[in-house]
From Swiss-Prot:
GO terms for cellular component: plasma membrane. HAMAP family: UPF0295 (MF_01502). It is a multi-pass membrane protein. The chain crosses the membrane at residues 12-32, 43-63. InterPro entries: UPF0295. This is UPF0295 protein BcerKBAB4_0454.
Length: 118
């Protein structure tokens, strides 16, 4: 069983979702410090800022998602969005590329870096 690839857009969305839960957890920890109003307020504000940060990340990936190329995955025949030179299908995690020079090569995220020359 090889390496499991994941779509970049899904990775960023997962990060934003985790920020929501982490923020809520941090804010909830503030309840345990009810005696000290400064510590309680600090925990709640940090948690609130994490939730706001997740909103910013969701907004950013939504705007980025509108500019991506939509293709049909050759494996599952479902439409998927591609970000960069190489990416994975959102549905079946099939490695995909639009660069003819990279066809047949092993999937690697380094192909998306500007410093990489094919």
């Amino acid at each position: 069983m090889g390496i499991k690839y994941s779509n970049k857009i899904n990775k960023i969305r997962t990060f934003a979702l985790s920020l929501v839960f982490i923020g809520l957890f941090i804010a909830y920890l503030g309840v345990f410090f009810r005696e000290n109003i400064i510590i309680m307020t600090t925990f709640m504000m940090v948690g609130f800022l994490a939730v706001i940060a997740s909103t910013v990340v969701y907004f950013w990936i939504g705007m980025l998602s509108t500019k991506t190329i939509q293709i049909i995955c050759p494996s599952c025949d479902k439409p998927t969005k591609m970000l960069g030179r190489v990416d994975a299908c959102m549905h079946c995690n099939q490695p995909l590329t639009l660069d003819r020079n990279l066809e047949g090569k092993e999937f690697d995220e380094k192909y998306n870096k500007k410093s990489y020359k094919s």
